[in-house]
Amino acid sequence: MQHKLLINGELVSGEGEKQPVYNPATGDVLLEIAEVSAEQVDAAVRAADAAFAEWGQTTPKARAECLLKLADVIEENGQVFAELESRNCGKPLHSAFNDEIPAIVDVFRFFAGAARCLNGLAAGEYLEGHTSMIRRDPLGVVASIAPWNYPLMMAAWKLAPALAAGNCVVLKPSEITPLTALKLAELAKDIFPAGVINILFGRGKTVGDPLTGHPKVRMVSLTGSIATGEHIISHTASSIKRTHMELGGKAPVIVFDDADIEAVVEGVRTFGYYNAGQDCTAACRIYAQKGIYDTLVEKLGAAVATLKSGAPDDESTELGPLSSLAHLERVSKAVEEAKATGHIKVITGGEKRKGNGYYYAPTLLAGALQDDAIVQKEVFGPVVSVTPFDNEEQVVNWANDSQYGLASSVWTKDVGRAHRVSARLQYGCTWVNTHFMLVSEMPHGGQKLSGYGKDMSLYGLEDYTVVRHVMVKH
């Protein structure tokens, strides 16, 4: 396994403390990797800053060609990446290869094209004798912090728009799941000029803090927890850096009496438990109108009970383990607290799986109330709650009564209601009669404590640029 880091075009070993990297399906240590030192963090940022002088002035065509080459080598090495992701994250191998790798490749190809479509406003005379134009220019060095749930996918979401816009990047993947990012480093070093991409390894305190606080970093992009976002915003406040935050969610799934129940069951069975529920858009907070509540709970419980947890390399496995022992304990604690309320009923699951690895049974909880922690707090595991509601006004208020604002869905056959409710939901994305669908052309990002800024789409590309006015007297 490639375990070296990329700094200024060279693969190097870290000079800091060694950290274990685990296989969550077994609990075994895969390998130990040395963190970068503070001096290596500084070297990576300074390399990126030096490379920006030239990379920031390259043509969109040249940047697009590099991104397309990177997309091609990821596609060519798709099986290798999928196997690394499966071993390091516990993802079913078939899901990593068939679902994630094509989407990752598409992200780089999309932004390769988008790089050539990013324009400022056409020049015009708004003051006699002067011509004004609007430029969209890169910022400089971007520090990107990627999470552990979709390591390579999130690296793509961070790298592609930043590079397409002409920035240079220092990426820190999660210390829990670094292996695909380090493999990416090996392939990217021969495609991009030295310093344009730097990929480090280490924990937040020892590596993340000196990286995000570095005076030459102009922007910090994070996908992670609210707590991590709060820390980075506070840590970087004195230097007034631009920040781009995607901080999780607790997606409301609003199911009206007239919804297609079979479609809801099929959708939640898939989109509530994909990646073992470790997804910030997971369909995890169901509001079911009282007329169909009992039927939905019964049918969904039966469907969830058929989900198969197992070894990641088994073609029949639908759910792998959680990412770490610590996270398994967090998920288990959240469910135990829900059970202790007395009014929440476990329809299926509700316990750790016996044996090796960090497995938690796919769980459906019914009878949850609006103020329950299981409804209000992100669990980030294979746990879905169901709450009954009376009418449209009530459920819209309940759905919006959350600190999160990332994703939501509405299930109804009434087109007018679908538009009406979607317009009132305080979420970055609302799906109607589906959930979880993402495409590179559409923006992904939240409101409230789910953060700000957009990933993917031209809006995502714009987030990595600065708007500048140039006026010429003539």
Swiss-Prot record:
Gene Ontology molecular function, alphabetical: aminobutyraldehyde dehydrogenase (NAD+) activity; NAD binding
Active site: E246, C280 (nucleophile)
Pathway(s) this gene product operates in, as recorded in its UniProt entry: Amine and polyamine degradation; putrescine degradation; 4-aminobutanoate from 4-aminobutanal: step 1/1; Amino-acid degradation
InterPro entries: Ald_DH/histidinol_DH, Ald_DH_C, Ald_DH_CS_GLU, Ald_DH_N, Aldehyde_DH_dom, Aminobutyraldehyde_DH, PatD
Matching Pfam families: Aldedh
Enzyme class: oxidoreductase
GO biological process: L-lysine catabolic process; putrescine catabolic process
Enzyme Commission designation: 1.2.1.19, 1.2.1.-
Keywords for this protein: NAD, Oxidoreductase
Positions annotated to bind NAD(+): A146, P147, W148, K172, P173, S174, E175, D209, S225, I226, A227, T228, C280
Catalytic function, reaction form: 4-aminobutanal + NAD(+) + H2O = 4-aminobutanoate + NADH + 2 H(+); 5-aminopentanal + NAD(+) + H2O = 5-aminopentanoate + NADH + 2 H(+)
Function description: Catalyzes the oxidation 4-aminobutanal (gamma-aminobutyraldehyde) to 4-aminobutanoate (gamma-aminobutyrate or GABA). This is the second step in one of two pathways for putrescine degradation, where putrescine is converted into 4-aminobutanoate via 4-aminobutanal. Also functions as a 5-aminopentanal dehydrogenase in a a L-lysine degradation pathway to succinate that proceeds via cadaverine, glutarate and L-2-hydroxyglutarate.
Complex formation: Homotetramer.
Record family assignment: Belongs to the aldehyde dehydrogenase family. Gamma-aminobutyraldehyde dehydrogenase subfamily.
Miscellaneous comment as given in the Swiss-Prot or TrEMBL entry: 4-aminobutanal can spontaneously cyclize to 1-pyrroline, and 5-aminopentanal to 1-piperideine.
Protein's UniProt name: Gamma-aminobutyraldehyde dehydrogenase
Species of provenance: Shigella flexneri serotype 5b (strain 8401)
